[in-house]
Amino acid sequence: MKLLHVDSSILGTYSVSRQLSAEIVAEWRKSRPDTTVEYLDLALNAPNHFGADAIAIKGIAQPEPTEAQRAENALSEQLVSQFLASDVIVIGAPFYNFSIPTQLKAWIDRLAQPGRTFTYNEKGPLGLATGKTVIVASTRGGAYSTSEGGQAMEHQESYLKVVFGFFGITDVRIVRAEGLAMGDAPKAAALSAARADMELATA
């Protein structure tokens, strides 16, 4: 079994999402010691934002791609191949400005490739990356899951569920710690709740 461990927080050792994603991987391996782990730190090795050079080879017919276009295409192929070769993907995904870190979005944009992770048929979109499990370490400074107003502002977990569902992945598990910036007691409660989620997510 192959596990891809992805972190995206820019906070380094201060990051709770990094702490939780590492704990998830460790818990997963306790009962599956044969799991091989590959690590991707998007804060240290962020792909370029998806631009014209990245899509040129696949989306625009031209006689000879430029060196920049070849380089961007090679990076996209490397990332999507790594993703498709993984059985389990553990993602540290903090809540930044109501959504996910830009580095994580840039990675997902490289994965969203027609013919690799999705296609279309007469009924609409069809995900091609089936049979995988995604576990998200979701961290938030405030509390957004407990009210309609908060849920309306949340485009982090909801986005990840939609995009991985679009890729054909129906097993998306959330390990959530929210309210981390609301004081010591709420933070302790959030971490306790996250570890309870973790026990279920790694079972």
Curated annotation (Swiss-Prot):
For this protein, the record's SUPFAM superfamilies field holds: Flavoproteins
Gene Ontology molecular function? electron transfer activity; FMN binding; oxidoreductase activity, acting on NAD(P)H as acceptor; oxidoreductase activity, acting on NAD(P)H, quinone or similar compound as acceptor
Instruction: List the cofactors.
Output: FMN
Q: Which Pfam families match?
A: Flavodoxin_2
Gene3D superfamilies membership? 3.40.50.360
- Reaction(s) the record says it catalyses: 2 a quinone + NADH + H(+) = 2 a 1,4-benzosemiquinone + NAD(+); N,N-dimethyl-1,4-phenylenediamine + anthranilate + 2 NAD(+) = 2-(4-dimethylaminophenyl)diazenylbenzoate + 2 NADH + 2 H(+)
Described function: Quinone reductase that provides resistance to thiol-specific stress caused by electrophilic quinones.
Complexes and interactors: Homodimer.
Belongs to which family?
Belongs to the azoreductase type 1 family.
**Protein name (record):** FMN-dependent NADH:quinone oxidoreductase
GN (gene name): azoR
